[in-house]
From Swiss-Prot:
<keyword id="KW-0813">Transport</keyword>
<keyword id="KW-0406">Ion transport</keyword>
<dbReference type="Pfam" id="PF02537">
    <property type="entry name" value="CRCB"/>
</dbReference>
<keyword id="KW-0407">Ion channel</keyword>
<keyword id="KW-1133">Transmembrane helix</keyword>
<dbReference type="GO" id="GO:0005886">
    <property type="term" value="C:plasma membrane"/>
</dbReference>
<dbReference type="InterPro" id="IPR003691">
    <property type="entry name" value="FluC"/>
</dbReference>
<keyword id="KW-0812">Transmembrane</keyword>
<keyword id="KW-0997">Cell inner membrane</keyword>
<feature type="transmembrane region" description="Helical">
    <location>
        <begin position="83"/>
        <end position="103"/>
    </location>
</feature>
<feature type="transmembrane region" description="Helical">
    <location>
        <begin position="52"/>
        <end position="72"/>
    </location>
</feature>
<feature type="transmembrane region" description="Helical">
    <location>
        <begin position="21"/>
        <end position="41"/>
    </location>
</feature>
<comment type="function">
    <text>Fluoride-specific ion channel. Important for reducing fluoride concentration in the cell, thus reducing its toxicity.</text>
</comment>
<keyword id="KW-1003">Cell membrane</keyword>
<keyword id="KW-0472">Membrane</keyword>
<dbReference type="GO" id="GO:0034220">
    <property type="term" value="P:monoatomic ion transmembrane transport"/>
</dbReference>
<protein>
    <recommendedName>
        <fullName>Fluoride-specific ion channel FluC</fullName>
    </recommendedName>
</protein>
Length: 109
């Protein structure tokens, strides 16, 4: 891995962290990240560009640990029904949004 490629991943991770700081909503962040992920994987871009966008930006932006912390906080408050619904809604919604991003990416040339 060359230094410029590594720097680009770090730059996109920094940008994602900056955006994540201002968007403190796990559902919104997950939806945006899933859409971007679906869009990028549908495009014919180089493997390096995909790694920069998906590893650098999407992975840092969506941060699975933020999602898990959100679910943990609901569970320790004893809201297990709410936990069940949030868990399922977030997963299903993100799959649908990722598929929509994929379809849109295929249509855009």
């Amino acid at each position: 891995m060359n230094k410029i490629f590594f720097f680009k991943i770090l730059l996109f991770a920094y940008l994602a962290s900056f955006l994540r700081f201002f968007l403190n909503n796990n559902l919104l962040v997950g939806v945006i990240g899933s859409f971007v992920y679906g869009f990028v994987i549908s495009r014919r871009v180089s493997k390096l560009k995909k790694e920069i966008l998906l590893t650098g930006f999407c992975s840092c932006f969506t941060s699975f640990s933020g999602f898990v912390l959100f679910l943990y906080e609901i569970s320790i408050q004893g809201y297990f029904l709410k936990l069940f619904f949030y868990l399922n809604i977030i997963i299903v919604l993100n799959l649908i949004i990722m598929y929509a991003g994929f379809l849109l990416g295929r249509k855009v040339t």
